[in-house]
Curated annotation (Swiss-Prot):
Domain AFP-like: 282-334
Class of the enzyme per the UniProt entry, highest EC level: transferase
EC assignment: 2.5.1.101
Cleaved signal peptide residues: none
InterPro entries named among the record's database cross-references: AFP_Neu5c_C, AFP_Neu5c_C_sf, Aldolase_TIM, N-AcNeuraminate_synthase, Neu5Ac_N, Nonulosonic_Acid_Synth, SAF
Record protein name field: N,N'-diacetyllegionaminic acid synthase
Stored SMART domains: SAF (SM00858)
Amino acid sequence: MKKTLIIAEAGVNHNGDLNLAKKLIEIAADSGADFVKFQSFKAKNCISTKAKKAPYQLKTTANDESQLQMVQKLELDLKAHKELILHAKKCNIAFLSTPFDLESVDLLNELGLKIFKIPSGEITNLPYLKKIAKLNKKIILSTGMANLGEIEEALNVLCKNGAKRQNITLLHCTTEYPAPFNEVNLKAMQSLKDAFKLDVGYSDHTRGIHISLAAVALGACVIEKHFTLDKNMSGPDHKASLEPQELKMLCTQIRQIQKAMGDGIKKASKSEQKNINIVRKSLVAKKDIKKGEIFSEGNLTTKRPANGISAMRYEEFLGKIATKNYKEDELIRE
């Protein structure tokens, strides 16, 4: 089984504060995640002045500002990107960022990013998909809100414009913050695998870590999860994010699950082998048996340990003649 890649999604939980963004990088690195991911955008390039906030954003941000005003406060400029990439390198964690507009695609490409993460909202954005495809980079494509037809169309655009199909990973996702458990539909991961024959992961917007863990057990090769310094901070995504200790627990338990998946061959494990003779049973004298007596249900039984004749041969011995004397509880040796 491939190692599951863990993307710790800082997103916009830095609240526009570069020092907080650096702290989030340190938390992600300490947790054991493989990547820390931010979001790159020029708000005016991707949000019109008429765009309304999503219902979850209305609950977690000021009601007297537009979506554009809310998002403008969360922008990271070129200098900030460079500082964060350098800080991630110092912390020994890979840097990712999701571009939300064409200008930001160029910015991330110029900064040398090797992997481009396409968010669910851009899966129907033709100019955006074509631009990323032409970079011929590895792509992680989130599929929240999309049906199989829309995903197929996006894949066709990517592959016809320069992206290599084998370099694309799909992420199943439910685009709601937090996502209701009854709408997660983890079985859709298998539907994506069957339909497109690509690696499939899961972008988790539920509360807690257990749904991500279930996704790993179902074969997710990537897990993406939002995290924050404090869920009670002001901002659109904090409430649906993990706090540092939860992120660390997620990473630890994902690694444990991966070890537990094994190779699928059913056999006694190395640690079990020493217990075979201890917990299995052998043929034992139920009471004293004299030489020449016939073994019967009345004088023959099965008990631990298993270093005698296997209890599976019980019926084979019924009716046989004992060739020696046995004391009660003595292992049968014939």
